[in-house]
C-alpha cells in the first residue's frame, strides 16, 4: 500500500482547480490531472482517504479510454510521468500511477449519464412516475432489473458541494446545440454497450455510468474519467439478483454505511471507521484487478 495522497501542493505549478477527487494544474498548452485518494459521498468530501484509490481510478480510466479509441478520441497525452514536462519531474514519487497529462479541451456544460439497469435515483424516479428522467419505461420492472435498452439521461454539471440536476434531452440541445447533443448521445450509448460486453466477460455488470465530453480543435473528445468505480455502478455478475439493491465494487458500500448514521448528508462529514476505509479500498482494487487483470 502506498502513502495516502489527500491533497497535492506543487508550488511551481499553477493550480487551476481542486475538485472532489482531482487536483488540476494548468501547464500552459496542457493540463496535469492528479487523482488523489479523497472520496466523497452525497457530494460531501470525507475526512479520510481511501488508500490507492487515485491509482485505481487512473488505471481504470486509462484502460477504458484505450478500449474506446475506435469510437471516440480521448484527452490523454500520457500517463507516464517520464513524458510529462520537466517541471513535473521533481514530483514523480507522488504523480506515478495517479496522474495524466491531458489536452486542454473546452468541457461541454452537461454530464452524460447512461443507465443499463434500474437503480439508485432512477429506481426512485421509476417507482414514483413509471419513467426515468421523463423516459417512459415498461410496467412491472423490479429494482436492479436490466432495462430493455440502455437510456441516455443527461444532467447539469453542479458546482462543488451542490447536486447535479437531471435535464431533458431537449434542454441538452439548448445547452450544447442539436448536432453536438445528438452525437454525444450516440457515442455515449455506443461506449456503454461496448464496455458492458467487455465487463460481462470479466464478471462485472456496469449498471450505469457517467461521462464528460469536451471540444478540442473543433472535435468532440471524451475527457475527465472513464467508467471508474467513482463514476459508475459496478456489480458482481455472479451474485446478481434483481428485486433489490446489489453488492458493488464502488462507493455504494460507503454510502450504505453512511445511511446507517444520524447524519444530515452535509458538511462536516462524520469520521469513518478504519474497517469501512479498508473495505472500500478493497472493493476499488478488486474492480481494477477484475477489469484489467492487474492490481498494484
Swiss-Prot record:
Q: Name one GO cellular component term.
A: cytoplasm
Keyword terms, alphabetized: ATP-binding, Ligase, Nucleotide-binding, Purine biosynthesis
Pathway(s) of this molecule:
Purine metabolism; IMP biosynthesis via de novo pathway; 5-amino-1-(5-phospho-D-ribosyl)imidazole-4-carboxamide from 5-amino-1-(5-phospho-D-ribosyl)imidazole-4-carboxylate: step 1/2
- Which enzyme class? ligase
Enzyme Commission numbers on file: 6.3.2.6
* Top-rank lineage group of the source organism: Bacteria
Q: Which GO terms describe its molecular function?
A: ATP binding; phosphoribosylaminoimidazolesuccinocarboxamide synthase activity
Can you state which reaction this protein catalyses?
5-amino-1-(5-phospho-D-ribosyl)imidazole-4-carboxylate + L-aspartate + ATP = (2S)-2-[5-amino-1-(5-phospho-beta-D-ribosyl)imidazole-4-carboxamido]succinate + ADP + phosphate + 2 H(+)
UniProt feature coiled coil, ranges: none
Which NCBIfam families would you find in this protein's record? PRK13961.1, purC
Q: What protein family does this chain belong to?
A: Belongs to the SAICAR synthetase family.
Q: What is this protein called?
A: Phosphoribosylaminoimidazole-succinocarboxamide synthase
What organism is this sequence from? Geotalea daltonii (strain DSM 22248 / JCM 15807 / FRC-32)
Amino acid at each position: 500500500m502506498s502513502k495516502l495522497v489527500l491533497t497535492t501542493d506543487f508550488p511551481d505549478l499553477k493550480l487551476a482547480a481542486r475538485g472532489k477527487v482531482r487536483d488540476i494544474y494548468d501547464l500552459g498548452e496542457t493540463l496535469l490531472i492528479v487523482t488523489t485518494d479523497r472520496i466523497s459521498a452525497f457530494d460531501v468530501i470525507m475526512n479520510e482517504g481511501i488508500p490507492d484509490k487515485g491509482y485505481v481510478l487512473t488505471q481504470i480510466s486509462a484502460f477504458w479510454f484505450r478500449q474506446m479509441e475506435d469510437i471516440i478520441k480521448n484527452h490523454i497525452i500520457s500517463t507516464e510521468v517520464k513524458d510529462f514536462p520537466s517541471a513535473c519531474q521533481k514530483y514523480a514519487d507522488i504523480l506515478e500511477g495517479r496522474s495524466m497529462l491531458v489536452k486542454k479541451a473546452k468541457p461541454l456544460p452537461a454530464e452524460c449519464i447512461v443507465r443499463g439497469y434500474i437503480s439508485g435515483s432512477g429506481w426512485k424516479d421509476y417507482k414514483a412516475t413509471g419513467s426515468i428522467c421523463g423516459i417512459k419505461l415498461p410496467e412491472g420492472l423490479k429494482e436492479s432489473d436490466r432495462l430493455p435498452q440502455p437510456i441516455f439521461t443527461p444532467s447539469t454539471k453542479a458546482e462543488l458541494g451542490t447536486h447535479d440536476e437531471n435535464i431533458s434531452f431537449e434542454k441538452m440541445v439548448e445547452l450544447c446545440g442539436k448536432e453536438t447533443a445528438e452525437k454525444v448521445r450516440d457515442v455515449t450509448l455506443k461506449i456503454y454497450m461496448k464496455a458492458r460486453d467487455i465487463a460481462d466477460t470479466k464478471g462485472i455488470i456496469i449498471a450505469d455510468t457517467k461521462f464528460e465530453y469536451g471540444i478540442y480543435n473543433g472535435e468532440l473528445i471524451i475527457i475527465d474519467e472513464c467508467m471508474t468505480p467513482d463514476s459508475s455502478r459496478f456489480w458482481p455478475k455472479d451474485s446478481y439478483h434483481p428485486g433489490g439493491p446489489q453488492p458493488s465494487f464502488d462507493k455504494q458500500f460507503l454510502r450504505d454505511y453512511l445511511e446507517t448514521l444520524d447524519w444530515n448528508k452535509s458538511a462536516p462529514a462524520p469520521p469513518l471507521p478504519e474497517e469501512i476505509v479498508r473495505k472500500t479500498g478493497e472493493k476499488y482494487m478488486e474492480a481494477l484487478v477484475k477489469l484489467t487483470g492487474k492490481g498494484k
